[in-house]
C-alpha cells in the first residue's frame, strides 16, 4: 500500500475539499523529492473512481511523455489539448520589408463534461506573456490566459516546483502564483505545498543539495553556495567530458544530457561530443546523431516541440541550397542561403514511438543562438512564396494591403488566402525542422525533462550570488533522476570571500555596552556592579551628576571605601577607568575585579531575520569569543557593517562589512592595545 507523507495526506484532503468546493484552481507546489507526481497519480485514480473525467497536460512534449509514463495516464501538450489548426486571423508587415502574412490558430471547441478536471504538470514553465513567431501564433498569444478561456470555468490543477526557473522573459511563474490567478482571472484559488521529502529519497546527496538551494531561494539569501558530493553526486574537477564518455564507448548515451548556462557553451560541448564519437572529419550529420528541436513544428502529423530530443535514423548527404533574396526595406535586400537536408528521425511522445521523414534546416545545426533569427525566418517565408502558383502570388500584394489597413477581404481574396495558408502549413521547406545537436543544451531547453545521468557545467559570466543563478542551478541539478556530475560550480560561504585586515591601534575606543531597549546603558552597568559587589560582600553606590563621569563607590564590611570614575561617551564606556581613592589593598583588589567584570553584559542578543547568514555568523563569532575568553559587550549595526564590541586583552571592536547581497567582504579590527592585543590576534587568526 502506498505510504504518503503527512504533507501528502494534507494535500489529498485539500484536493478532495477542492473538488466539492467553489474554487476553480488548485495549486500543488513542491520541491524535488516531495512526491508531486505520486500525488497526481493518486488524484487521477480518485477521479476515475468517481467516474469523473480528467485531462493531463504539460507545457512540452518531453514533459508530457514523462508524466504519462509516471502516472500511466494519457497526457498531451497544452497546445495540442486546447488549440486547433483553424486560422482565425492574419496580419502583415509594412515598410516594404518581407514580413509576410501571419496566421493565428483558434482555441478548440470544448466539449468536455462540466465536471472535468484539468491537470497541468511542470506549471512553472507556463507563461502568460504574449508570444508569437514570424508566421504563427496561438489564440491570444498568452498560453495561460487561453487555458482559462478553454476551461471555461472547469476546475484546473496546476502542479509545479516554485523554485525552478520561471518562463522565458518572465521573472515569476504565473501558473504557481495564487495572487496572479485572483487578480488576472478573478477566480477562487486553493492549494497545498509539499515540504517533506519522501522516504525513498532520504540519503540522496543530490536531493540534499537541491533542498539547500531551494531554501536559499525561499529565504532570498544568496550568500552561500556549495555542493556536497556523494554516491549520486560528483564534482568533475577535470571536466565533464571524460565521465560523459565513460557511460558509452561507441555512441552517445541516450540517457545522458549536458546542461550549460549559454547556447554557445552548449555548442562547444556538442562539437566535442561529435568529434569524440564520430571523428574530427565526420559529416555535419550522421545516422545516430541526437538532435534537440528548437522550434515547435506541427507539419508532420505529430507535434515536435521545442526541447524534444530526437534520434537521426537516416540522413542524406546531399544538401539542397536555396539562395533567397530578402528585402530589408524598400531599397535594401540581402541574400540568405538556406540549406536543407532530408532526414529520418525517431522519438517518443506521450502516445509511444514515432518515426518521421522530415526536411531539416541544416543551417541551424551549429548555430550558437537559441532560436533562428528573424532574417532566416523571413527567408523561409520568401522562399515559400517563390514556389506559389502565379494566381496566389499575383494576389498577395492586394491581400497584404487589405490586411494591413484592416479592410475586409473579397470573396476571391478569402479563397486565395485560404489556399495560401493551406500550402504554407504543408510546405516541407517552410516547415523544415529547426533543430541542433542534442547532446548539450541550456537549462531552459532541458526544463521539463529528466535524464538518468546529467552533467552540469555551472560556469556563467557575471555574478552567481543572485536569485536568477540559484534558480538556474536548482533547475539544472534537478534534471537528474539518477546521477549528477557538476563542473566549475561556485563554492563560497558567507565568509569565504572575506578579507581579514591586521589589527589597528585605537587610543580612544569608546565601546558600546548592550542595554535592553528603552534602558540606560549606565544604569544597566551599575545593576551588574551591584550584583557582582553583593557576591563579594561589598555594597556599591553610584553618582551620575557629572557629565561623562560615572562615579562608583564600594564599601566593605569593615567600613573601608574605594571610589572610581568610569569614563563614558554618548554610546558607551571608554577604556579609561580612574581609581580615585581606596584605604584597603584587599578592597582595592575586589573592587578592581568587580569594575572589570561589570563591563560585559550577561548576554548580547542578535536578531537579523532579513539576513539569515548574519545570524549564523554571529553565533559562530560568539562561540569563538567564548573559547578565547573574550567578553562580548555589544553588537551594533551600521551602514553595511555589523560591529562586535569586545573586551579582549584590551577594549576592541570587530567590524564586519557586507555587500548588498549579504556576503561579508572584509573584517576590520581595532584595539586599545593594537597588535599587542594577544586575545584579539588569536581571534583574527581563526579567520585566516
Where are these regions (language model features)?
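N-terminal accessory interaction module
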Residues: 330-331, 528-599, 619-687
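Short, conserved phosphate/pyrophosphate- and ester-handling motifs at nucleotide-, phospho-/glycolipid
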Residues: 8, 60, 262, 448
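Catalytic phosphate/metal-binding cores of nucleic-acid and nucleotide-processing enzymes, i.e., regions
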Residues: 5, 61-62, 300, 436
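N-terminal pre-Walker A segment at the start of P-loop NTPase domains
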Residues: 1-13
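Conserved helicase motor core of P-loop NTPases
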Residues: 11-19, 23-24, 142-145, 149-154, ...
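ASCE P-loop NTPase helicase motor core
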Residues: 13, 17-18, 24-221
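C-terminal accessory regions
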Residues: 329-338, 343-527, 531-534, 554-561, ...
Amino acid at each position: 500500500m502506498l505510504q504518503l507523507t503527512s504533507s501528502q495526506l494534507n494535500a489529498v484532503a485539500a484536493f478532495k475539499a477542492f473538488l466539492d468546493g467553489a474554487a476553480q484552481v488548485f495549486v500543488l507546489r513542491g520541491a524535488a523529492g516531495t512526491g508531486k507526481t505520486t500525488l497526481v497519480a493518486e488524484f487521477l485514480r480518485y477521479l476515475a473512481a468517481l467516474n469523473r473525467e480528467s485531462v493531463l497536460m504539460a507545457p512540452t512534449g518531453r514533459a508530457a511523455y514523462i508524466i504519462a509514463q509516471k502516472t500511466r495516464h494519457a497526457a498531451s501538450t497544452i497546445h495540442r489539448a486546447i488549440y486547433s489548426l483553424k486560422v482565425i486571423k492574419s496580419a502583415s508587415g509594412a515598410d516594404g520589408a518581407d514580413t509576410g502574412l501571419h496566421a493565428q490558430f483558434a482555441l478548440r471547441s470544448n466539449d468536455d463534461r462540466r465536471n472535468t478536471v484539468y491537470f497541468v504538470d511542470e506549471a512553472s514553465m507556463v507563461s502568460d506573456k504574449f508570444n508569437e513567431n514570424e508566421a504563427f501564433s496561438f489564440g491570444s498569444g498568452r498560453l495561460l490566459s487561453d487555458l482559462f478561456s478553454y476551461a471555461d470555468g472547469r476546475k484546473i490543477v496546476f502542479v509545479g516546483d516554485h523554485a525552478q526557473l520561471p518562463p522565458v522573459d518572465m521573472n515569476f511563474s504565473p501558473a504557481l502564483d495564487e495572487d496572479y490567478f485572483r487578480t488576472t482571472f478573478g477566480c477562487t484559488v486553493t492549494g497545498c505545498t509539499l515540504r517533506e521529502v519522501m522516504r525513498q529519497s532520504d540519503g540522496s546527496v543530490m536531493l540534499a543539495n537541491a533542498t539547500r538551494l531551494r531554501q536559499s531561494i525561499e529565504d532570498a539569501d544568496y550568500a552561500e553556495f556549495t555542493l556536497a558530493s556523494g554516491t549520486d553526486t560528483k564534482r568533475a574537477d577535470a571536466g565533464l567530458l571524460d565521465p560523459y564518455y565513460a557511460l558509452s564507448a561507441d555512441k552517445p548515451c541516450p540517457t545522458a544530457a549536458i546542461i550549460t548556462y549559454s547556447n554557445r557553451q552548449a555548442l562547444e560541448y556538442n562539437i566535442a561530443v561529435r568529434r569524440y564519437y564520430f571523428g574530427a572529419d565526420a559529416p555535419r550529420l550522421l545516422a545516430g546523431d541526437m538532435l534537440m528541436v528548437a522550434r515547435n513544428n506541427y507539419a508532420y502529423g505529430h507535434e515536435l516541440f521545442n526541447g524534444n530530443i530526437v534520434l537521426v535514423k537516416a540522413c542524406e548527404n546531399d544538401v539542397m541550397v536555396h539562395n533567397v533574396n530578402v528585402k530589408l526595406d524598400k531599397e535594401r535586400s540581402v541574400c540568405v542561403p538556406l540549406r536543407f537536408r532530408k532526414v529520418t528521425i525517431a522519438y517518443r511522445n506521450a502516445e509511444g514511438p514515432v518515426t518521421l521523414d522530415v526536411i531539416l534546416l541544416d543551417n541551424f545545426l551549429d548555430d550558437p543562438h537559441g532560436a533562428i533569427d528573424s532574417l532566416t525566418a523571413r527567408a523561409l517565408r520568401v522562399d515559400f512564396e517563390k514556389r506559389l502558383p502565379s494566381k496566389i502570388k499575383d494576389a498577395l500584394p492586394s491581400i497584404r494591403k487589405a490586411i494591413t489597413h484592416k479592410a475586409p477581404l473579397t470573396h476571391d481574396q478569402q479563397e486565395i488566402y485560404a489556399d495560401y495558408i493551406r500550402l504554407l502549413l504543408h510546405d516541407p521547406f517552410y516547415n523544415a525542422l529547426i533543430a541542433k545537436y542534442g547532446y548539450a543544451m541550456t537549462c531552459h531547453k532541458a526544463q521539463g525533462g529528466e535524464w538518468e545521468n546529467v552533467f552540469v557545467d555551472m560556469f556563467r559570466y557575471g555574478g552567481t550570488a543572485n536569485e536568477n543563478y540559484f534558480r538556474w542551478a536548482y533547475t539544472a541539478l534537478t534534471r537528474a533522476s539518477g546521477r549528477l556530475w557538476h563542473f566549475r560550480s561556485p563554492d563560497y560561504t558567507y565568509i569565504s570571500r572575506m578579507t581579514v585586515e591586521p589589527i589597528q591601534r585605537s587610543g580612544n575606543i569608546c565601546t558600546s555596552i548592550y542595554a535592553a531597549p528603552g534602558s540606560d546603558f549606565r544604569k544597566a552597568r551599575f545593576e551588574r556592579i551591584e550584583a557582582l559587589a553583593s557576591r563579594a560582600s561589598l555594597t556599591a553606590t553610584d553618582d551620575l551628576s557629572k557629565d561623562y563621569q560615572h562615579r562608583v563607590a564600594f564599601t566593605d564590611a569593615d567600613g573601608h571605601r574605594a571610589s572610581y570614575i568610569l569614563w563614558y561617551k554618548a554610546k558607551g564606556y571608554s577604556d579609561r577607568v580612574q581609581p580615585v581613592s581606596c584605604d584597603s589593598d584587599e578592597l582595592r583588589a575586589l573592587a578592581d575585579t568587580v569594575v572589570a567584570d561589570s563591563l560585559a553584559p550577561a548576554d548580547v542578543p542578535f536578531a537579523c531575520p532579513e539576513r539569515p547568514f548574519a545570524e549564523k555568523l554571529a553565533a559562530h563569532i560568539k562561540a569563538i569569543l567564548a573559547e578565547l575568553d573574550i567578553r562580548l559587550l555589544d553588537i551594533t549595526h551600521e551602514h553595511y557593517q555589523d560591529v562586535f564590541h569586545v573586551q579582549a586583552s584590551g577594549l576592541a571592536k570587530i567590524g564586519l562589512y557586507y555587500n548588498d547581497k549579504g556576503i561579508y567582504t572584509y573584517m576590520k579590527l581595532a584595539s586599545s592595545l593594537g597588535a599587542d592585543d594577544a586575545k584579539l590576534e588569536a581571534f583574527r587568526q581563526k579567520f585566516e
